[in-house]
Amino acid sequence: MRVAEVVRNTSETQIRVKLNLDGTGQQKLATGVPFLDHMLDQIARHGLVDLEVEAHGDTHIDDHHTVEDVGITLGQAVAKAIGDRKGIRRYGHSYVPLDEALSRVVIDFSGRPGLEFHVPFTRARIGTFDVDLSIEFFRGFVNHAGVTLHIDNLRGINAHHQLETVFKAFGRALRAAVELDERAAGQIPSTKGSL
């Protein structure tokens, strides 16, 4: 089983992430940021990743450090669970609609961190959640998972729908990329022989 647990403690946050890449989408989430919990639930359910996240952060200031550090810790946990990346499909993509919103996410477990994030949010906040923090979450993830990630919201009027389609598509793209390919068992999915 491809499981990992990572604990990250700083002066700003204390975070624990436990995941099973070959799960069924079960989750236990307590980040102290309700909208982030809602988005992590999308990753778990659509990625079929069993996911536990506990976070305590300086949310009395704002949610920035908690959201960013959860992204970092999730990236570390995914990288640890995948290990040497042998046998994975490496690439994944997904389009997800929600009413008027449509997003596309493409991921490459290349070993080269990179983020292209193009979401023209229609408002700055979803409830109390600052939509700019979604960029910080994904930046933290890509830098610590070692992936290239392209996120595009192709259309949308409702900011909640825009971001929810992004997280659902991310979960589905992640699931596709980390899936084991029986025909490539034990092989690194690269002509270089390493990722």
From Swiss-Prot:
The keyword Amino-acid biosynthesis is assigned to this record: yes
Protein EC: 4.2.1.19
GO cellular component: cytoplasm
Listed InterPro entries: IGPD_sf (IPR038494), ImidazoleglycerolP_deHydtase (IPR000807), ImidazoleglycerP_deHydtase_CS (IPR020565), Ribosomal_Su5_D2-typ_SF (IPR020568)
Pathway in which this enzyme or protein is active: Amino-acid biosynthesis; L-histidine biosynthesis; L-histidine from 5-phospho-alpha-D-ribose 1-diphosphate: step 6/9
Cellular localization per UniProt: Cytoplasm
Keywords: Amino-acid biosynthesis, Cytoplasm, Histidine biosynthesis, Lyase
Main location as per UniProt: cytoplasm
One GO term of the biological process aspect: L-histidine biosynthetic process
Protein's UniProt name: Imidazoleglycerol-phosphate dehydratase
Organism of derivation: Burkholderia lata (strain ATCC 17760 / DSM 23089 / LMG 22485 / NCIMB 9086 / R18194 / 383)
